[in-house]
């Protein structure tokens, strides 16, 4: 009977994120779909060998558990090596400019600055985005400014500071507080040698959790405001949105973000690349992201070594296809209404 009770629990938590509920107790189950897939498979095996269904209700539970397991496999399958890549290598990559980006949530209380500097020196990214940075981290990374003459500094001691280091010229840089007054984002144009700059947006919204926001409404609103901003950018320009989004790529809002922007998640066909929590291998999920427009092609995507943070850094190299115009995706009225409703709810809650 204990197995059937656990089976019912696993069915419920697989379905809860499909509801419109935004409380962290509901949204949190979306993060661990991979882990619950393994638990569902284990319970199915145990039922088959040790407590095979006899009564009608037991058959209903067992079949429902199997259906929930198949559903979760369907959700996470695109983020495996067995799924086709969304982008492919350009026909003539040598004619295109290739640049690189390293993104890392460093954990504000982490003082192992040298570990991040070591990774930066090893991979030599053109762009370096670090999050949860305060004045101590700014000072700890001071030596990098010799190689990165352009720096956007937003030091904060609330675990939402952000610094962007660039080897290239940045223009029209804005530090925005889109939803919450103490959670910044960076919007900038990267001039990497082409007359058409790379549009770069760096974000780190607060998650739904028992220690932070009670619901996902603020996070959802920020991601969708960014999504609307992406739609207003020049379609000739390559676009990248990156950072610790505090959301998994298969969530309703992440998929809604991809739908309204047309941006591509390079995890599709490459793997999960779980980045958090670095200290617990059995409880990791992918929440550090990079989304890119169709005129950007990812060449390399790698999770780097632990730097003492609770997040692993991510490293990307990508080709920029100059001059290729990308059409904005059409969105229906129902999608548009959902986007506006979620934004309004998040802004209202953040007041």
Where are these regions (language model features)?
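Membrane-embedded alpha-helical segments of integral membrane proteins
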Residues: 1-50, 54, 61-72
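Generic hydrophobic alpha-helical membrane-segment signal
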Residues: 5, 18-21, 60, 93, ...
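Intrinsically disordered, low-complexity boundary segments flanking structured domains
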Residues: 15-16, 87-91, 139, 252-253
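N-terminal signal-anchor transmembrane helix
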Residues: 49-122
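Soluble catalytic domains of enzymes that build or remodel membrane lipids, polysaccharides, and related
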Residues: 101, 107-121, 129-351
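Short acidic/polar active-site loop segments enriched in Thr and Asp
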Residues: 126
């Amino acid at each position: 009977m204990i197995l059937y009770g656990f089976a019912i629990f696993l069915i419920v938590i697989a379905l809860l994120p499909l509801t419109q509920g935004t409380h962290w107790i509901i949204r949190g189950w979306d993060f661990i779909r991979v882990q619950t897939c393994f638990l569902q498979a284990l319970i199915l095996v145990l039922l088959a060998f040790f407590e095979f269904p006899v009564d009608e209700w037991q058959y209903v539970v067992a079949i429902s558990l199997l259906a929930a397991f198949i559903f979760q496999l369907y959700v996470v399958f695109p983020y495996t090596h067995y799924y086709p890549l969304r982008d492919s290598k350009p026909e003539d990559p040598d004619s295109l400019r290739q640049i690189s980006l390293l993104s890392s949530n460093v954990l504000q209380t982490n003082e192992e600055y040298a570990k991040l500097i070591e990774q930066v020196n090893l991979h030599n990214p053109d762009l370096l985005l670090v999050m949860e940075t305060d004045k101590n981290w700014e000072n700890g990374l001071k030596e990098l400014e010799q190689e990165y003459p352009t720096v956007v500094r937003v030091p904060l001691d609330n675990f939402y500071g952000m610094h962007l280091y660039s080897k290239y010229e940045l223009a029209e840089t804005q530090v925005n507080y889109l939803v919450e007054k103490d959670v910044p984002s960076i919007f900038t144009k990267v001039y990497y040698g082409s007359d058409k700059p790379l549009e770069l947006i760096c974000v780190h919204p607060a998650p739904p959790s028992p220690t932070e926001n009670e619901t996902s409404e603020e996070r959802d609103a920020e991601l969708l405001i960014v999504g609307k901003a992406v739609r207003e950018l020049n379609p000739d320009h390559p676009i990248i949105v990156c950072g610790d989004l505090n959301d998994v790529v298969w969530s309703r809002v992440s998929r809604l973000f991809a739908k309204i922007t047309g941006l591509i998640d390079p995890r599709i066909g490459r793997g999960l690349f779980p980045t958090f929590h670095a200290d617990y291998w059995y409880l990791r999920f992918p929440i550090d992201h990079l989304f890119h427009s169709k005129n950007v092609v990812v060449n390399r995507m790698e999770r780097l070594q632990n730097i003492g943070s609770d997040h692993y850094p991510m490293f990307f190299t990508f080709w920029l296809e100059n001059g290729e115009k990308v059409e904005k995706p059409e969105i229906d009225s129902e999608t548009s209404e959902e986007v506006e409703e979620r934004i309004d709810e998040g802004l209202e809650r953040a007041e």
